[in-house]
C-alpha cells in the first residue's frame, strides 16, 4: 500500500468528501478520469494527491499504474481560520475559513 497526503488545503471538508466519493473503490485509471472531469476545486486537489500516491508506488516498488486500486480516501478537517465581516451599526459577523487534510492510499489489485 502506498500513501500520499496533502495537509492544510483551503477546501471545506464537507465539499471535499463529495469529491472523495467519486473515486472510492475504483481503479487508479478510472479515478483519474472521474477527477479530471470534475468541476470541484476539491477534485483537482484530490487528483494531485492521487497522482502523488501513484508516483510513490511506481518509484519505490516498480508497480505499474494499471495494477493499482484506490483502497482508501480520507478527508479530515484541518484548522479553521476565523475572520470577521463588518456589519451595520458597528457589529460584525464571523467568517470561518475551513481547511482539510486529504489522504489517499492505493494498492495492488487482488487477483
Curated annotation (Swiss-Prot):
GO CC, sorted alphabetically, is: cytosolic large ribosomal subunit
What is a biological process (GO) this protein takes part in?
translation
Going by the entry's taxonomy, the superkingdom of the source organism is recorded as: Bacteria
Q: Which residues form the signal peptide?
A: none
Report a single Gene Ontology molecular function: structural constituent of ribosome
Subunit relationships: Part of the 50S ribosomal subunit.
Annotated family: Belongs to the universal ribosomal protein uL22 family.
Database matches in NCBIfam families = rplV_bact
Q: Which UniProt keywords apply?
A: Ribonucleoprotein, Ribosomal protein, RNA-binding, rRNA-binding
Q: Which SUPFAM superfamilies match?
A: Ribosomal protein L22
Q: What is the protein named?
A: Large ribosomal subunit protein uL22
Which organism was this protein described from? Chlamydia felis (strain Fe/C-56)
This chain's function reads:
This protein binds specifically to 23S rRNA; its binding is stimulated by other ribosomal proteins, e.g. L4, L17, and L20. It is important during the early stages of 50S assembly. It makes multiple contacts with different domains of the 23S rRNA in the assembled 50S subunit and ribosome.
One Pfam match: Ribosomal_L22
Amino acid at each position: 500500500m502506498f500513501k500520499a497526503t496533502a495537509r492544510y488545503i483551503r477546501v471545506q471538508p464537507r465539499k471535499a468528501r463529495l469529491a472523495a466519493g467519486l473515486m472510492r473503490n475504483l481503479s487508479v485509471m478510472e479515478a483519474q478520469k472521474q477527477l479530471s472531469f470534475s468541476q470541484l476545486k476539491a477534485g483537482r486537489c484530490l487528483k494531485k494527491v492521487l497522482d502523488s500516491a501513484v508516483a510513490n508506488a511506481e518509484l519505490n516498488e516498480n508497480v505499474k499504474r494499471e495494477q493499482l486500486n484506490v483502497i482508501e480516501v480520507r478527508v479530515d478537517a484541518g484548522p479553521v481560520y476565523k475572520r470577521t465581516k463588518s456589519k451595520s451599526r458597528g457589529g460584525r459577523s464571523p467568517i470561518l475559513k475551513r481547511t482539510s487534510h486529504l489522504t489517499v492510499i492505493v494498492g495492488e489489485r487482488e487477483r
